[in-house]
Amino acid sequence: MRLTDIEIEQCLDNGTIIIDPRPGIEAISGVSVDVRLGSQFRVFKDHTAPYIDLSGPSAEMQIALDRIMSDKIEIADDQAFFLHPGELALAVTYESVTLPADIVGWLDGRSSLARLGLMVHVTAHRIDPGWQGKIVLEFFNSGKLPLALRPGMTIGALNFERLSSAVARPYNTRKSSKYKDQQEAVASRISQDK
């Protein structure tokens, strides 16, 4: 069942869910906790690659990904990152989140931002039980105007569901976890898929 604001506060108080820095009471509403935008981004560089073969040999795929993905971009707190129409960028939340093995989290974008064309996650909005780290945001601007995104702005909301039991393989204990303890906007690691 989805956790209510009262249950979320209890989980934060007893350390079942850890959000660092801990959100203020004003960030917790009926069934969610607001999260803010961090200061790290990654974008797709201009490139001449005609495509990326997502089922090709891992080494070739990694070379193509390295060629098109930028290094980490750090934005100062008083500056903005501009996301232009049709662009995809990666970023991270300001907050780091730790979930136990019996709670799954979900990231939702804000309706007010979606009405301007901003998608906060392209498809990956589940936060696995056992997750520990910052949440990567997959921004896409489907609107007509560039959007200025500033570190610290409220960018989305997390909600949580308690599972019927703890999972047998929490995210942070699996050897195959590609984004374990993530603290920055990590590029796709699809080439590590088995």
Swiss-Prot record:
It catalyses: dCTP + H2O + H(+) = dUTP + NH4(+). InterPro entries: dCTP_deaminase, dUTPase-like_sf, dUTPase_trimeric. GO terms for biological process: dUMP biosynthetic process; dUTP biosynthetic process; nucleobase-containing small molecule interconversion. The keyword Hydrolase applies. It is an enzyme of class 3 (hydrolase). Keywords: Hydrolase, Nucleotide metabolism, Nucleotide-binding. Transmembrane segments: none annotated. Coiled coil: none annotated. Residues 174-194 are annotated as: Disordered. It comes from the Bacteria. Its EC number is 3.5.4.13. The keyword Hydrolase applies. GO terms for molecular function: dCTP deaminase activity; nucleotide binding. Pfam families: DCD. The active site is at E138 (proton donor/acceptor). SUPFAM superfamilies: dUTPase-like (SSF51283). DCTP binds at R110, S111, S112, L113, A114, R115, D128, V136, L137, E138, Y171, K178, Q182. Pathway: Pyrimidine metabolism; dUMP biosynthesis; dUMP from dCTP (dUTP route): step 1/2. Belongs to the dCTP deaminase family. Catalyzes the deamination of dCTP to dUTP. Homotrimer. This is dCTP deaminase. It comes from Shewanella frigidimarina (strain NCIMB 400).
